[in-house]
Amino acid sequence: MSFSFLFLGNLPLAEGFGINTNIFETNIINLAAVVAIVISFVGKNLSALLEDRRKTIVNNLQEASQRAAEAQERLNIAKNQLEVAKKKATEIREEGVFRATQEINNCVAQHEERLSKLEEFKQETVQFYQQKAFKQAYVYIISRIMSRVKERLNKGLDATYHVVVNNFYVSRFTEYNP
């Protein structure tokens, strides 16, 4: 304060409040006045603005943390769903392999059954044609025998054949037991 009195004491009385030509002193005084005004008026507003900004940043961080926690929870749910889907896919694949194996076994069994029926049918067919061939051979042989017998009967029996026929009937009668 003593400085201000000295400063006022050095001023001539006649000069008053005129234009100060010392720019350096004027600028320092003006700067000090502006800084004092800014600090007194703007300081409270600036601290309020900074406090609001701090609260906004804290709220944003809390919201970001909450969203990160929600995202982590959704990620965990998605991972669980993926594991469930993988297990389900494995079960479906195993069931598919089981059913395919079962179907292959069924097809093989049906094929073997058809082959056995075909083999049985083949054997029956071969047996049928063998019997047919034997029957035809029997019919042919019997017809040939009958035709030769007819020829003999038509020609007549000579003494040797007459004796053979009589011996045949005699042997039949002796075998007969009433």
Curated annotation (Swiss-Prot):
Location, primary (coarse class): plastid
Source organism per UniProt: Tetradesmus obliquus (Green alga)
KW Electron transport (keyword) present: no
The entry's keywords: ATP synthesis, CF(0), Chloroplast, Hydrogen ion transport, Ion transport, Membrane, Plastid, Thylakoid, Transmembrane, Transmembrane helix, Transport
Any Pfam family matching the protein: ATP-synt_B
Keyword Membrane listed: yes
A molecular-function term among this protein's GO annotations: proton-transporting ATP synthase activity, rotational mechanism
Cellular component terms per the entry's GO annotation: chloroplast thylakoid membrane; proton-transporting ATP synthase complex
Topology of this chain in the membrane: Single-pass membrane protein
Localisation: Plastid, Chloroplast thylakoid membrane
Quaternary data: F-type ATPases have 2 components, F(1) - the catalytic core - and F(0) - the membrane proton channel. F(1) has five subunits: alpha(3), beta(3), gamma(1), delta(1), epsilon(1). F(0) has four main subunits: a(1), b(1), b'(1) and c(10-14). The alpha and beta chains form an alternating ring which encloses part of the gamma chain. F(1) is attached to F(0) by a central stalk formed by the gamma and epsilon chains, while a peripheral stalk is formed by the delta, b and b' chains.
Protein name as annotated: ATP synthase subunit b, chloroplastic
Additional observations: In plastids the F-type ATPase is also known as CF(1)CF(0).
Protein family according to the UniProt entry: Belongs to the ATPase B chain family.
Its biological purpose: F(1)F(0) ATP synthase produces ATP from ADP in the presence of a proton or sodium gradient. F-type ATPases consist of two structural domains, F(1) containing the extramembraneous catalytic core and F(0) containing the membrane proton channel, linked together by a central stalk and a peripheral stalk. During catalysis, ATP synthesis in the catalytic domain of F(1) is coupled via a rotary mechanism of the central stalk subunits to proton translocation.
Annotated InterPro entries: ATP_synth_b/b'su_bac/chlpt (IPR002146)
TM spans (from-to): 23-43
